[in-house]
Amino acid sequence: MAYYLYMLRCEDGSIYTGVAKDYLKRYEEHLSAKGAKYTKSHKVVKIERVFLCDSRSIACSLESEIKKYIKKKKENIISKPDSFIKDIENVRKIKIKKIF
């Protein structure tokens, strides 16, 4: 079953990364302070990037990896998503698709 990996911009400029079956519903939860603990204290302002993954395990694995990145590397994923996808496909031998 497909899952989405999403990246949100917060009011303070930070980037939140998460996983959901329905990223738009989850985005609404983040906006209404019903989302993650982090987004309750760091107000979400917009969706920056969304990727479609073939499974929850792939999405969660990528989420965990991205959360360890420094901000500059996260910004590169947002600004150059095709490079990120190419790297993931070459290194991890998995397919993901840019949605937004």
Curated annotation (Swiss-Prot):
Residue ranges annotated for the GIY-YIG domain, each copy included: 1-77
Pfam families the record matches: GIY-YIG (PF01541)
Annotated InterPro entries: GIY-YIG_endonuc, GIY-YIG_endonuc_sf, UPF0213_domain
Record CDD domains: GIY-YIG_UPF0213
Gene3D superfamilies attached to this UniProt entry: GIY-YIG endonuclease (3.40.1440.10)
SUPFAM superfamilies (alphabetical): GIY-YIG endonuclease
Family: Belongs to the UPF0213 family.
Name of the featured protein: UPF0213 protein FN1575
Source organism per UniProt: Fusobacterium nucleatum subsp. nucleatum (strain ATCC 25586 / DSM 15643 / BCRC 10681 / CIP 101130 / JCM 8532 / KCTC 2640 / LMG 13131 / VPI 4355)
Lineage: Bacteria, Fusobacteriati, Fusobacteriota, Fusobacteriia, Fusobacteriales
